[in-house]
């Protein structure tokens, strides 16, 4: 759960990031979601310019992120003894947190169902057509092959890497999404206490780096990579990807 220091001040994203972070404690209680406000650190190494952290601090302060500050190595190592020798300072966001994304997604779905939302699973959208002030959505059930048509005043396109397909059915502004695959390494619970905060790397010309974080279940999560791929369903992991994670993570821990 991001603190909100990276979003551009004045944008809707910045407003909702900080507001959403604030609401997480209540949401976790209401929906019984595993949630821990463990705080996050954006670490800066010897070969990086500290001004990058200062810019994030300025953005976070403008966005209203509470208790945001830069801490020096002595205090930092007291908080996280296993940080790399190259780490010199870090931006500390106490409001950062972690959840289980699977539990969270299911909790949202269960709550929606309780509130009357109907789910049409295994249902493929074939076409979306503008019909006056509404939309006509033609679907095919992938198991029974039954066809069904829906009318809707509003269609929310939440199709991920396939969002361009549905956008292009109705919009003159055609889109093409190039999928970007991220590989993670989930370590055993024996490694779960290696760090207690979510450790981000300061973005550089070489990319955003990888994070190292505990999970709410006690594991350690490292990642992701970021590789453009042609196959939108390429969810396989690779030896080269995992090697890259290990090498990049070593910059911070």
Can you say where each PLM-predicted feature lies in the sequence?
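Active-site substrate-recognition segment that forms the wall
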Residues: 1, 22, 26, 31-37, ...
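Dinucleotide-binding Rossmann-like beta1-alpha1 core, especially the glycine-rich loop
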Residues: 2-79, 88, 209-210
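Short beta-strand to alpha-helix junction loop
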Residues: 12-18, 43-52, 91-113, 120, ...
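A short, glycine/Asx- and small/polar-enriched loop/turn
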Residues: 48-51, 79-87, 129-136, 192
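General beta-strand structural signal in soluble alpha/beta enzymes
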Residues: 69-72, 119-121, 157, 222
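Helical element adjacent to the flavin cofactor pocket in flavoenzyme catalytic cores
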Residues: 91-154
